[in-house]
Structures are given as structure tokens and as C-alpha cells.
Amino acid sequence: MRKEMTFCLYMSYLLLPCGITAQTALHRPSRTLFNPAITGSPDRNFVLEFTSTDGTDNNGVTKVTYMDGLGRVTQTVTSGMSPTGTDIVSLTEQDALSRTTRTWKHGCSTNTIPCAYVKKETAQTQLMAFFDDEAPYTDYSFETAPDGRLLAEMAPGATRRNKDAKKEYYYTVNCSAESHLGCSTFRYDVRKDLSFSISQAGKCADGTYRVKVSTDEDGNSLYEFTDMGGRLYLRRTVINGNDADTYFLRNGMGETVAVLTPKLMEEGIDKENVEKYAYLYVYDGRHRISASKTPGSGWKRFRYDAADRLVMEQDANMDETGICKFHIYDRHGRECIVGTCSNGIGDTDWSRNIVSCRLADRLKNTPFGGYDVEGIAIDSPSLLKVNYYDGYGFLELYGDLLTYREEETGTDYMPNPVSRLTGCRKAVVGGNEGAFIASAFYYDERCLPLQTVETNITGGTDVESFAYTDGAQVAVRRVKHLMQNGKAASEEYDYTYDSAARIKTERFSFEYDGKRVSNYSAIALHLN
């Protein structure tokens, strides 16, 4: 069992069933590393969360979230994360309509009672002193309407406020008579046979699109045109007074069929420029992308099975050589086999089937890395990757190459890690025909990675092993390279953590043929 615990304490008006008292219904963690016996302020509404870092209720992080009478978060106090032992506090302020108008940066508090509520004025003074800044907060302003939209946002820092540097927003509709608010309409047709035509068809009628205008601290403006369904039609960036437009053209189902880039709009819309600068998409009858084209490249086509899983794909280079790339999944939808084949992309007799695979009873008598494939006939398969899950029956395909090395970990592995990737085989592209790299992944009783054994292109084996703290952080990582000449090189990484499970120190050492070559730490660099 993985040793992780999180306790939550909700403090407000509690209605307890008969026979249950507050003492038996609530569990309060006894202490954390820096702040013993932490509880929230009893005169406030709060939620207390304790996250253990070592599987016990002695060491960890306590977070108390305070709320007002309407359940709105007003203050968050965290204990056990600061190396000095002080609390970390943050404030949130709302207006009468419950909109967040100010958020303060997280900073250290001088509060003497761990995780106790800090009065608003006191917390503000402490945060300004901590950051040595009169404005360590972000301000937001809204329209006066109850559902008012955001009008301005000013980032933290007194310097920004002195310069009135803020990000501003305003809202309008498209209008051809106004600068930067006009937009074009297009005639377009992207067909299933991959023929297409796109042309400009004049200006959009005024009021067709809603426009949100954002202006940052440097005066740069962004115009976003959306239709009545909230779908983006045009994104316009104003650069030195010039418009850089990106149009998103959609079909009647709201699916994007073309993206017209700023370079295309600058060069002019014709067939050659569309080929060079536009993104194009085609959909099948089930609204899945059946073909796509990126600027300057050929078409890429996709075919799916009855479970809507991608089974075949082909790019322009594959089309020239007459091959396709295939993907086969198991019954849980996990990708098991990837490779190339000589099937035609137009051959979709299998598309009404659920294409899947399962481990064969006789693993060595299958061309699919130990799997039997169902629902499709693959012609001349060439495997690129094979994944194995849930167990280690596949190991008989690879002899002793991927055997678990217990001497490296000192413990046994979980024999049936359900839902985990347990092995992988990858082809070496450009190497000897049939060459591949095989891997086995072993897990401990908590399903944490315990050891990876992998062959390499030099004919040797790499063994990566892990040891963990009680809180599931990596304490030791060791990589051993076993070479064909019988020698070995090893790397070792040691980690220590603070009470909040953050890396405190990291130590690295390297050995070759039993001799230590160098030794480093993350803070002291070279040690010996």
C-alpha cells in the first residue's frame, strides 16, 4: 500500500448523527514537523487539509483555507512548507457581487500561532514588509453589471502602479468603419477527395461577430472575433499599427476546416499560397479528422475502426512509397503495436470492425511481437514499437536479456502490475534489418517503478533501479551499464527532501569498472 494520507477538517456549523460527538467524528493531525497541534481558528469558517509526506500524521504540510459567511475564500494559511517554520499566507478580496478584485502574493507571516487566522490589515502589512513592496497584489476591475466582464488587470508591484501599467479589455462588435474592427468573409470548399478552393468574398456585415480587445502594459493590442456560439473566427494582433490576422473557417457543424495564417493574408489568397501557408482539415461522416494538411507539406490521411480509434495513417512520403502506418490496441484501448504495412489507405473494409489484439498462446509463432491481431488483415507488417501490459509473459520472447536483477534493489517485484506498462520493443530505424531495443519495467508493491532493464544498440544491457522514501519520493536512482566486454559503468543519484517533499540535496557519483571517477552534488558541484 502506498503510504500517502490527506486529512481534511471542515469547521463550520456541523450537524452530527445521533450518538456521534465532534471528538469521534473528526480527526485532527497531531502535529507537523515545524508546528505541533495545528488547528484552525475556531471562530472562523475553515477547511483544514493535512498532507503527509512520509505516510504518518507526524510530518507533512497543513493548509487551512478560511472563508467568510458566504463561503467565499478570504485567506489561505499553509504551515510546514517554509524552511524557517513560519506560515505562508495569501489573501483574496471580493466585491459585493463576489467577484475577485484583488489577490495577494503568497508570503511569510510572523504569526505566532500556526495556521491561525491573520487579521486582514495585519496580513497586508506583513506581506508588504516581506516583499518590501507597497503593492504585492494583482488588482481586477469589472463592468458594473452583475455579470460584468473584466475591464482591467494590474499585476503586482508599486512600480507598475506608478506608471499605471495594466492590461485593459473592452468589448464591441465588428464594424468596417472602425480601425482594426473590420473583417473579411470567405468562400471555401475542402472536399473529401482533398481538392479545395478558398477565396475572399468581401467584408463581413457589421455586428456579425463579438470582439474582445486586449491591450497589454506595452500598448500591444489583440482583437478576438467570436461568433454567437463563442467560437473563434479571427485573431488579430496589431504590430506597429499593422494587422496580423489568423482566420478560422468552419463548416456547418462548427468543425475547423481551414486556418488562414497571417503570412497567407499578407501574400494574398490563391491556390499556390494556400498550399504554402494554410492549415486544412477534412472530416468523415462521424466527424473525425480524415485528412489534414500543414503549411508546405502534403496531405496526411487517417482511418479509424468502429471504436473510433486511429488504425491507419499515411503522409505524403508514405504515399509515394506505397506504405501506411498502423496502430493496434488491446481491448482496454491501450496502444500495443505500431508499424508500417503495404495496405492501401483507401482499403477500409475493416473500418466496421473493432480492430484489437491479444497476447498469443504461443508467443514465438506470431509476426506481431507475441500478439494475435483481430479485425484487420495487415499486409507485410514491419514493427516499429510493441508495448506489453499487466504481466511478464512476454519475457520468454527475449530469453535472459530482460531478467529482473534483484541484487540491484534488494527486494522482489510485483508479478502482476495490472494496468501498468511492463515491456516495450522499439525498432532501430536505419540500423540492421530487424534490430530492436527491448525493455522490461518492474514495479514494487506500491506500483512505483522499481527497475527498468533495457538492451542497447552496442549489444549490452542498461539496468535502472530505484529506492524510495516512505512518502514515495525517489531516494536513490542507480543506472548500471553492462557492456559486452564484461565491464560495467554505473551512475548513482541520491536525493534528500524537506518536510514538504521538495528536493533539498542531490548527490551524483559515477563509477567505471569498479573505480569511482567523479562525485558531485547539486549545491557543492565537484566533491572529489
Mark where each language-model region is.
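Bacterial Sec-dependent N-terminal signal peptides
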Residues: 1-27
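Beta-strand elements of repeat-based all-beta scaffolds
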Residues: 22-528
